């Protein structure tokens, strides 16, 4: 029998992914081969929003992605969401986020599954980034690695035997609110000297602004 070349049908199914942080909500759509076919972002300021408002914006971004797919949206297999702060991925619950004060014990997975009637997967946005990096850069072949993320917060997550080390309560690697020697800036959590208040992207911008004010840097 002659060999037959086979390939994955890109229209076999579609996936939607959404991630939000302090400053923006980002939504993408992928075909069955993992090719990016839709990419949208909306700027927000979560500290000025309520949890319900952020969830509605997340839903709106997902609906926009579904509208882009049109008839193909009937083949959406699942939705993945990466959320900031502390979370329980096994139960699909967002526990807390310091930039969104009423973001407490939100059943994000259940809310989205009831809204869109497809399977949803929820995890911390850094954990989601780890798996994306692992597959896109190493083709999933790297079983052990250490991932460092410094954005609005600082987190270090090890992957051992293809699994992120989450810790007993799921807080493993959350270094942002560890107090550092000499830290004097107020953190979003209300304390002084947290690592986030010294090395996060927001902290760096604030330091530059302060430097401009005292003439250390030029505008």
Regions found by a protein language model. Give the residues of each.
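Hydrophobic "anchor" residues
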Residues: 36, 94, 164-165
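A mobile "lid/hinge" subdomain adjacent to the ATP/sugar-phosphate binding pocket shared
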Residues: 195-219
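Glycine-rich phosphate-binding loop of actin/hexokinase-like ATP-binding domains
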Residues: 141-198
């Amino acid at each position: 029998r002659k060999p037959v070349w086979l390939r994955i049908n890109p229209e076999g199914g579609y996936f939607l992914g959404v991630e939000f942080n302090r400053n923006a909500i980002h939504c993408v759509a992928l075909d069955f081969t993992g090719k990016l076919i839709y990419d949208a972002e909306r700027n927000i300021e979560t500290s000025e929003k309520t949890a319900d408002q952020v969830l509605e914006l997340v839903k709106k971004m997902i609906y926009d992605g579904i509208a882009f797919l049109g008839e193909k949206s009937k083949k959406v297999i699942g939705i993945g969401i990466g959320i900031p702060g502390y979370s329980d991925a096994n139960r699909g619950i967002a526990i807390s986020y310091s930039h969104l004060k009423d973001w407490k014990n939100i059943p994000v997975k259940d809310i989205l599954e009831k809204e869109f009637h497809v399977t949803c997967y929820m995890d911390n946005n850094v954990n989601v980034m780890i798996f994306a990096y692992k597959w896109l850069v190493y083709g999933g072949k790297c079983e052990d690695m250490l991932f460092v993320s410094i954005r609005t917060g600082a987190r270090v997550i090890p992957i051992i035997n293809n699994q992120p080390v989450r810790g007993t309560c799921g807080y493993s690697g959350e270094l942002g609110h560890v107090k550092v020697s000499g830290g004097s800036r107020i953190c979003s959590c209300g304390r002084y000297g947290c690592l986030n208040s010294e090395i996060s992207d927001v902290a760096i911008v604030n330091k530059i602004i302060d430097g401009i004010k005292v003439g250390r840097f030029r505008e």
